[in-house]
UniProtKB/Swiss-Prot annotation:
It comes from the Bacteria. One of its GO terms (cellular component) is cytosol. The keyword Transferase applies. One of its GO terms (molecular function) is phosphoribosylaminoimidazolecarboxamide formyltransferase activity. Coiled coil: none annotated. Keywords: Hydrolase, Multifunctional enzyme, Purine biosynthesis, Transferase. It comes from Xylella fastidiosa (strain 9a5c). Belongs to the PurH family. PANTHER family: BIFUNCTIONAL PURINE BIOSYNTHESIS PROTEIN ATIC, BIFUNCTIONAL PURINE BIOSYNTHESIS PROTEIN PURH. This is Bifunctional purine biosynthesis protein PurH. Residues 1-149 form the MGS-like domain. One of its GO terms (biological process) is 'de novo' IMP biosynthetic process.
Length: 527
């Protein structure tokens, strides 16, 4: 099969994306390839002074119904589906000439339906019928026919034609066929998702369910991983076909070893946490939990404070900052500790040069523009849980003071900082903080009071004074015991959602200890 090169004598071009069309047509003609085309595609080729035959002349049947019917004809599909050495006689009998190359992309359904003023009629008009049919015909017959669905594929296609004197290999035809079927599957999934979400088709703009009756998501494999979460598991990394800008999946790896499954899980936790801060910030993550977070005048300051929270856990961690990482900060990190992954929006040249001293460190660049993904997905046995992303933040004017003592301005800033961090800590989550840095973090405990105790232990191990610090809890306190433990540690202000049956007991405990407490009315469970 490796030597199965076939010449291209005839090509059909029908594209909605006209990028590179004229250049492609001119290049194909240089190999004496006959061009067929439809509608606007043929017009552009002809206006460029290039010879092209209209499909309507081939079929003997005009385009009709505003272009809805133009290629659904045996002269077209027979030319694409005809098998060399098998269908030659029947093709000759009916005057069907082979089509060796199909260049086609589909009506822009996703772009049209993404517009706020898109009506149901607009969406339906953008559903391509003839295009997917031709793509499937050409891709099914990859033994003889090649098919390209995107301008991104033109350079490689032309390079192979040039390298092999107007011929394409079986491997190239097969790879293009797979891409074509993937393209059609993605297109049909987009149509299904849109129509399944329509709850009222009679309004001017269709009312749509947040969660469609059927969900079809498309992912593209970026790389296979050495193994999964553990060495006995296999693993791979897939990305949304349309990744949200600024999310982890858009990373560029600048150096270092191949990323592991656990690297990616931890990197996502670190990046999502750090990019919520407006001021320069640093987040250090271990096992998907922040073990140190700080905000400073510069990322160098933030790193120093974040590291000091828990130097033991920071070893072998993932470090993310939300500003360009300079050489001084790079040197401070790499000279002090072992790090698995570094993440930043960018790096100065000297920082990257210094990073090469530790060639195994994985250095990722992620443009910081963009918003959070709208939805989170979690697999369960034979099922998928879908929820809107926990993107709700709170500001000082929304805090409800529930104790006799109100927090000071400085405490209020620390409370909001700790609250932002708690959202990214596994439940039950307790965060001790002071002066825009974490003092101790208690994560993932089945009992909230134990998370509070662990936060205190972490602070003591790092020789950090808890006295005067604030405490954040991702969910309400079911009993007063966590407040008693916090008071014993020296906590002076608490932020929590509220909503417990025993809120009054918890508030009374805070008043007894002279602790200021505010309610957010928002819970931040993380599992």
């Amino acid at each position: 099969m490796a030597s199965d090169f076939l010449p291209v004598h005839r090509a059909l071009l029908s594209v909605s994306d006209k990028t590179g069309l004229v250049e492609l047509a001119r290049a194909l003609l240089a190999y004496n390839i006959e061009l067929l085309s439809t509608g606007g595609t043929a017009t552009i080729i002809r206006e460029a002074g290039l010879p092209v035959q209209d499909v309507a002349d081939l079929t003997g049947f005009p385009e009709m119904m505003d272009g809805r019917v133009k290629t659904l004809h045996p002269m077209v599909h027979g030319g694409l589906l005809g098998r060399a050495g098998i269908d030659d006689a029947v093709m000759a009998k009916h005057g069907i000439a082979p089509i060796d190359l199909l260049i086609l992309n589909l009506y822009p359904f996703e772009q049209i339906t993404a517009k706020k003023d898109c009506t149901l009629a607009d969406a339906v008009d953008t559903i391509d019928i003839g295009g997917p049919a031709m793509l499937r015909s050409a891709a099914k017959n990859f033994a003889r026919v090649a098919v390209a669905t995107s301008p991104d594929q033109y350079p490689d296609l032309l390079a192979e034609l040039q390298a092999h004197h107007g011929q394409l290999s079986a491997e190239k035809r097969f790879a293009l066929a797979v891409a074509a079927f993937n393209h059609v599957a993605q297109y049909d999934a987009a149509i299904s998702n849109y129509l399944s979400s329509v709850s009222d088709m009679h309004t001017t703009l269709p009312l749509r369910h947040e969660f469609p009756a059927q969900l079809n998501n498309t992912f593209v494999k970026m790389t296979e991983l050495r193994y999964g979460e553990n060495p006995h598991q296999t693993g791979a990394f897939y990305r949304d076909v349309h990744p949200q800008p600024g999310t982890l999946a858009t990373f560029q790896q600048l150096q270092g070893k191949t990323l592991s499954y656990n690297n990616l899980v931890d990197a996502d936790a670190a990046w999502e946490c750090v990019r919520q801060f407006e001021a320069p910030a640093c987040v250090i993550v271990k096992h998907a939990n922040p073990c140190g977070v700080a905000v400073g005048k510069a990322c160098s300051d933030a790193y120093e404070e974040a590291y000091a929270t828990d130097p033991t856990s920071a070893f072998g961690g993932i470090i993310a900052v939300n500003r360009m990482l300079d050489v001084a900060t790079m040197q401070s990190i790499l000279d002090r500790q072992f790090v698995e992954v570094l993440i930043a929006p960018d790096y100065d040249a000297d920082a990257l040069a210094y990073a090469t001293k530790k060639a195994n460190v994985r250095v990722l660049r992620i443009p910081s523009t963009g918003v959070m993904n709208r939805y989170d997905f979690k697999r369960i046995g034979s099922g998928l849980l879908v929820q809107s992303t926990d993107s709700l933040n709170i500001h000082s004017d929304a805090l409800k003071v529930v104790t006799q003592l109100a927090p000071t301005d400085a405490q209020q800033r620390d409370l909001l900082f700790a609250w932002h961090v708690a959202k990214y800590v596994k439940s039950n989550a307790i965060v001790y903080a002071k002066d825009n840095r974490t003092i101790g973090i208690g994560a993932g405990q089945m009992s909230r009071v134990y998370s509070a105790r662990i936060a205190g232990i972490k602070a003591a191990d790092a020789h950090l004074a808890v006295t005067g610090s604030v405490m954040a809890s991702d969910a309400f306190f079911p009993f007063r015991d966590s407040i008693d433990a916090a008071a014993a540690a020296g906590i002076k202000a608490v932020i929590q959602p509220g909503g417990s049956m025993r809120d009054n007991e918890v508030i009374a405990a805070a008043d007894e200890h002279g602790i200021a407490m505010v309610f957010t009315g928002i819970r931040h469970f993380r599992h």
